[in-house]
Amino acid sequence: MLLSVPLLLGLLGLAVAEPAVYFKEQFLDGDGWTSRWIESKHKSDFGKFVLSSGKFYGDEEKDKGLQTSQDARFYALSASFEPFSNKGQTLVVQFTVKHEQNIDCGGGYVKLFPNSLDQTDMHGDSEYNIMFGPDICGPGTKKVHVIFNYKGKNVLINKDIRCKDDEFTHLYTLIVRPDNTYEVKIDNSQVESGSLEDDWDFLPPKKIKDPDASKPEDWDERAKIDDPTDSKPEDWDKPEHIPDPDAKKPEDWDEEMDGEWEPPVIQNPEYKGEWKPRQIDNPDYKGTWIHPEIDNPEYSPDPSIYAYDNFGVLGLDLWQVKSGTIFDNFLITNDEAYAEEFGNETWGVTKAAEKQMKDKQDEEQRLKEEEEDKKRKEEEEAEDKEDDEDKDEDEEDEEDKEEDEEEDVPGQAKDEL
C-alpha cells in the first residue's frame, strides 16, 4: 500500500514525538516494589520504608507510596533503570511528596545517580548527578533544592525556591533543557525558571573588575558640600543647660554641713544646638565611581552544562526527625507535555478527594474534642456540686453539734446545784 507524502511525514512525526520514559513508579503491584528498590547496607540503622497511602488519601490504592516509618533516622533506598544520557534532549524529573506528619525537619528530595552507584552502599556522600526536591527544617528552611554535580562539585542554585509545607500531596517537577535553561514546577505550575549559567555558579564570571583601573584621586563622590560662604552667627553658641533663675537656696541650708549650694540646672531656651553650615550642590560632583570591567580571561562558555553521560539510579537519601512522608508517582522522561499529563492523571485526579477526606477527619476530630471537653466540664461541675453538697452537710452537722452543746450547758448547771 502506498502512502501519501503528507501522511508518511505525519506518521514519522508521531514516531519522533513518542516520549521516552526512562523510569516510572506508581507502586500499583502491592509488595512488588520490594524487588525493584534496594536498601543500602552502608549503615545498620537506616530507617525503613513501608508501602502506605497514609492516614488520608484521595484513592487508597493509587495514593500508595513509600512512607518513612521511623523517627530520627537516615533513609537510603534506591531503584535502578536502563542507563541513558540526556545529551541533546530534555530531562524531566517528577514525583509527589506528602508530609502528612506536619514535618518539622526532614528531606523530601530525590537524587539521580549514574548507574555506577553501588546501591547496597549508597549513603550521604555518594556522588550524584542531580538532587531535586523539598527540604524543611524549622521556620528558616522551607526550600526546593536544585543541585547539579558539575565537574565533581555540587553546585547549589542561587535563588530561593519556597516549597509547600502543608500536610497534602504535592507534585514537584524539574525540567532541564539542552539549551541550558531550566524550569521548576510545583503542582504543575511554574515557580521558577531561567538559565543554568545565570542561576548557578558553574563557570567563572564573564566579566571581572579591571585590575589596572583605580579611582582617580580627584574623583569627587560628594553630592552636597558645605557652603563656603556660610558662617556661624555670633550669638549662636549658648550653653545647653543653665542654672534655674527661679531656684532659691532653702532656708535651712547649712553650707558647713551641706556644702556650697548650687541651683539646679534647666534646659536653656536659647540653646540652638550644634551649628552646621548649609549644604549646596557640589560643583565638582562626578557621581559614584564605578570600577570598569573587562572580559574575564578565565571564562569559557560551556554549552553542555545541562548534559550528563549517564543516569541509572534514582535514590531516596535523606534524614527525617519526624517520619511519615510518602513518595509516589516517580517519573523520568524527556517529554514535558507527557510529564504534565502524567501529573494530572495521578496527583491531579486524587488531590481534591484527599483534601475532602482530611477535612472530614479534621471535623470529626473537632467534634470529638468538643464532646470530650463538654464531658470533662460536666464531670467537673458534678464534682464541684458534690463538693458543695458535702460542704453544706458538714456545716449543718457543725451547727447541730453547736446547738446540742448549748442545750447541755443549763442542764449541767442544774445538776451541780
Swiss-Prot record:
Per the Swiss-Prot or TrEMBL annotation, the motif Prevents secretion from ER is positioned at 414-417
**N6-(2-hydroxyisobutyryl)lysine modified-residue sites:** 64
Stretches the record annotates as N-domain: 18-197
**Principal subcellular localisation of the protein:** endoplasmic reticulum
Please give the InterPro entries that the UniProt record associates with this protein: Calret/calnex, Calret/calnex_CS, Calreticulin, Calreticulin/calnexin_P_dom_sf, ConA-like_dom_sf
Task: List locations, semicolon-separated.
Answer: Endoplasmic reticulum lumen; Cytoplasm, Cytosol; Secreted, Extracellular space, Extracellular matrix; Cell surface
Q: What's the name of the protein?
A: Calreticulin
Which keywords does this chain's UniProt record carry? Acetylation, Calcium, Chaperone, Cytoplasm, Cytoplasmic vesicle, Disulfide bond, Endoplasmic reticulum, Extracellular matrix, Glycoprotein, Hydroxylation, Lectin, Lysosome, Metal-binding, Repeat, Sarcoplasmic reticulum, Secreted, Signal, Zinc
Q: Where is this region: 3 X approximate repeats?
A: 259-297
Bias (Basic and acidic residues) ranges: 207-251, 352-379
Residues noted as binding an alpha-D-glucoside in the record, renumbered to the chain: 109, 111, 128, 135, 317
Q: Which GO terms describe its biological process?
A: cardiac muscle cell differentiation; cellular response to electrical stimulus; cellular response to lithium ion; cellular response to virus; cellular senescence; cortical actin cytoskeleton organization; ERAD pathway; intracellular calcium ion homeostasis
Read off the lineage from the record.
Eukaryota, Metazoa, Chordata, Craniata, Vertebrata
Q: From which residue to which does the signal peptide run? A: 1-17
Biological function:
Calcium-binding chaperone that promotes folding, oligomeric assembly and quality control in the endoplasmic reticulum (ER) via the calreticulin/calnexin cycle. This lectin interacts transiently with almost all of the monoglucosylated glycoproteins that are synthesized in the ER. Interacts with the DNA-binding domain of NR3C1 and mediates its nuclear export. Involved in maternal gene expression regulation. May participate in oocyte maturation via the regulation of calcium homeostasis.
**PANTHER family reported for this sequence:** CALRETICULIN (PTHR11073:SF16), CALRETICULIN AND CALNEXIN (PTHR11073)
Report biased composition (Acidic residues) as residue ranges.
252-261, 380-409
Domain description: Can be divided into a N-terminal globular domain, a proline-rich P-domain forming an elongated arm-like structure and a C-terminal acidic domain. The P-domain binds one molecule of calcium with high affinity, whereas the acidic C-domain binds multiple calcium ions with low affinity. The interaction with glycans occurs through a binding site in the globular lectin domain.
